[in-house]
Amino acid sequence: MELQDAIAAFDAQLAADGRSPHTRAQYARHAAALGRWLARTERSTDLAQLGHRALAAFVASPEARCRPDGVAKKATSTNALRTSLRTLFGYLADAGLMPANPARLLKRARCSPPPPRALREDEERKLLDHLAAEPGDAARRDEALILLMLRAGLRIGAALGLDVPDLDLAQAEAHVRKDKNDRAETVLLTPELVEHLRGFVGARRAGALFAGSDGERISIRHAQRRFAQAVLAAGIERKLSPHACRHAFATRLLAKTGNLQLVRRAMRHRSISSTAIYAAVAEEDVREALRAR
């Protein structure tokens, strides 16, 4: 079997397992990079000819370790590549398409995860003040979207997937039909957020919650561009993504409650290890405060 056919079979399995489009796309990118490296080094793409030595050589190559501009990738990026290869070839071995997993010897490098880049409170004020002063329906939509991420901790994809009927403002809830892992979840809304969303929704009873002038649901890419433009116009110098709003929600909730399990529930993390990164941020805040005394 050729590598390209194996990649297609692996992606079909990921889809059947309910893996998110983001996860599938990352696996596809890593597998495609391996294919390009095999072609460049004139190695066979036949699975029968692909062993652990070839995979080790690929992971050690500039294609795997450097960006297109030649700058070295972060250790976390290379670790993600190793994980993708182990998962891909583990599937091929389990499916009987290879006699064994040639990537089983690839080990993840030890590294600390980078701290989450959260929207600071002063940046939040600048951003919301800018949007409040902007005229037009698009600014009202952007403001509501950002508040939903800031006050409820939604991922941008989950927020944009909401329809108007998914909001139960009387119960202060939003019913997220498709989150990162295709799980149906109930998200709790603060009284302030409920009032803002009530004004934003108005008399609408159907359709996408966040729609463009044509009435169609806006895309994640469009929302990301709008967010970047608003950040720049608000005078915020740091480069931030919409996910900084979700990070801000978690960081502030932990600072307020000190309860990591509560934050895990609010963030809808399956594992507490995904939430623990915010505890490291909170500890650094304490150190900074002590140094300032």
Question: Which stretches of residues belong to each language-model region?
Answer:
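Conserved catalytic core of the tyrosine transesterase superfamily
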Residues: 1-293
